[in-house]
């Protein structure tokens, strides 16, 4: 409720701190890209999203499964797409044909854990594991 609004600046500050730690830790890792926030907006940094670029072997599903195996609660980002959920999939069964970019991006996006309970050491550990998975999962040219 309204009482939570008092804590909002603290939540946003913690989320931004986490995002910046991830940003520094994942900078320069081939095969993935941290989705940037537009500072012209007023972001709340609620999500830390990486986009896996090919040729990361196994793609998003393999990355999420490997992170879960390490007890890191990463998630597929906006999966399935709304167009594949009721009632839209029934009302518009051919929507996927019109949304190839949506399907592509959704199949490459991973949400990393964040929030006020995560410390810098935890985030750096997650980032190290993500970087290791990205490096070890790359296909040979």
What is the meaning of each model-derived region?
Residues 1-141:
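PLP-dependent aminotransferase class I/II
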């Amino acid at each position: 409720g309204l009482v939570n609004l008092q804590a909002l600046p603290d939540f946003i500050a913690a989320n931004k701190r986490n995002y910046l730690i991830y940003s520094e830790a994942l900078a320069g890792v081939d095969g993935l890209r941290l989705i940037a926030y537009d500072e012209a907006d007023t972001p709340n940094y609620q999500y830390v999203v990486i986009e896996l670029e090919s040729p990361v072997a196994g793609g998003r599903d393999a990355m999420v499964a490997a992170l879960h195996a390490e007890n890191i609660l990463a998630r597929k980002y906006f999966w399935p797409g709304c167009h594949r959920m009721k009632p839209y999939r029934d009302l518009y069964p051919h929507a996927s044909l019109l949304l190839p970019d949506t399907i592509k991006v959704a199949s490459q996006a991973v949400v990393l854990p964040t929030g006020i309970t995560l410390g810098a050491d935890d985030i750096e550990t997650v980032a190290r594991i993500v970087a290791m998975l990205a490096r070890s999962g790359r296909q040979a040219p």
